């Protein structure tokens, strides 16, 4: 199993050491969620771990492989009436009834009394497509950011740095930030980031709605129904029959298939067979975890969007004011760097860039950067060295 997921190992390893241009919630979308969806998609296609995705009972004169392939391509179905019957007395399995074959003259069950299951052959593709949509906001933000944070970090992300190199790099960084402030180079960055976070929120909601459509309108309440079923079963196992298991309603492990062929007289014959769907044992767990994950991700994404809106748009100086730094210059002289320069000299975009630098610079070097930026004038290399040593 691990050799199938080995390509994802390199992605996680490289992302752990990359420059951070967003927050933790944002990374949950394009790292954790994308990795999980791709892993699930790959595992579903790995038949050596789950066997054949469908196995149907043999019918006389029909090769088993033909019947399996036919039912896989055309889908299986469950009887709606069978879900309300007692398992073991009236039906052999939830959703599987006897004598429910449709007649050609309209007798018996109609198609409206059946629930057809054809989604299982598309589950891997749906998960892969979801992974793509979860990555798109990050791709958009990465394009808008354009590697700015990586370029500005220089070597200041290292803990140990020679004083001459440190002073020179602080000088270059300080000079750039002051020039960018005057030219307004960073004005659009906070808006772009906010739009990408909004896309994250919308994507979670749209993905849940899309899955609900694929699963026949049974996904939005899936996780809650499973939780209620588990609580009812644990409190009174005998009062909650297997027929009401919501996991079986959405992902049946046993269903029926109707096969048409020409008989010996030349008339069309309809044959019913029972099919096992081993792949649904995995599917039901994947979508249950996905339901709870999307719920958690939606809550965190909305909270992150509000935080970004407040700290980066409404109160741009508040983000740095949260991290007040007390520094000392000389003996007994106390100087408080509280980010007030951001509210007087730096705009929203500039404070946003400083917040990105805070995520990537060594705390000591970021501390010294704020000291240099405190001055209204641009710091020279000598002044930077004097202020930070």
Where are these regions (language model features)?
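Membrane-embedded alpha-helical segments and the immediately adjacent membrane-proximal loops
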Residues: 1-389
């Amino acid at each position: 199993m691990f050799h199938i997921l080995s390509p994802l190992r390199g992605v996680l390893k490289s992302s752990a050491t990359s420059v951070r241009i967003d927050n933790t919630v944002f990374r949950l979308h394009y790292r954790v969620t994308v990795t999980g969806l791709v892993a699930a998609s790959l595992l579903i296609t790995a038949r050596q771990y789950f066997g054949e995705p469908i196995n149907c009972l043999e019918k006389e004169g029909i090769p088993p492989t033909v019947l399996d392939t036919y039912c896989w391509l055309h889908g299986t179905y469950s009887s709606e009436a069978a879900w309300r019957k007692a398992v073991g007395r009236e039906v052999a399995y939830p959703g599987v009834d006897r004598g429910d074959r449709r007649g050609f003259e309209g007798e018996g069950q109609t198609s409206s009394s059946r629930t057809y299951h054809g989604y299982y052959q598309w589950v891997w593709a749906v998960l892969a497509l979801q992974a793509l949509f979860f990555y798109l906001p990050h791709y958009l933000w990465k394009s808008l950011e354009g590697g700015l944070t990586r370029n500005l970090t220089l070597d200041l992300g290292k803990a140990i740095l020679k004083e001459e190199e440190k002073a020179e790099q602080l000088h270059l960084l300080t000079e750039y930030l002051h020039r960018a402030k005057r030219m307004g180079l960073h004005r659009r960055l906070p808006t772009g980031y906010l739009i990408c976070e909004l896309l994250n929120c919308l994507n979670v909601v749209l993905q849940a709605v899309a899955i609900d459509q694929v699963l026949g309108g049974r996904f939005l309440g899936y996780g809650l129904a499973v939780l209620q079923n588990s609580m009812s079963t644990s409190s009174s196992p005998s009062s909650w029959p297997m027929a009401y298991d919501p996991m079986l309603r959405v992902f049946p492990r046993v269903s029926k298939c109707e096969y048409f062929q020409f008989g010996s007289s030349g008339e069309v014959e309809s044959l019913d067979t029972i099919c096992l769907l081993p792949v649904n044992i995995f599917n039901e767990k994947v979508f249950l975890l996905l339901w709870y994950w999307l719920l958690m991700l939606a809550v965190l994404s909305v909270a992150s969007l509000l935080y970004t809106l407040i700290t980066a748009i409404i109160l741009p100086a508040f983000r740095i004011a949260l991290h007040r730094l007390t520094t000392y210059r000389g003996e007994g002289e106390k100087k408080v760097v509280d980010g007030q320069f951001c509210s007087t000299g730096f705009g929203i975009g500039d404070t946003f860039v400083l917040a990105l630098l805070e995520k990537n610079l060594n705390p000591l070097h970021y501390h010294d950067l704020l000291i240099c930026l405190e001055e209204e004038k641009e710091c020279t290399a000598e002044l930077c060295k004097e202020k930070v040593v």
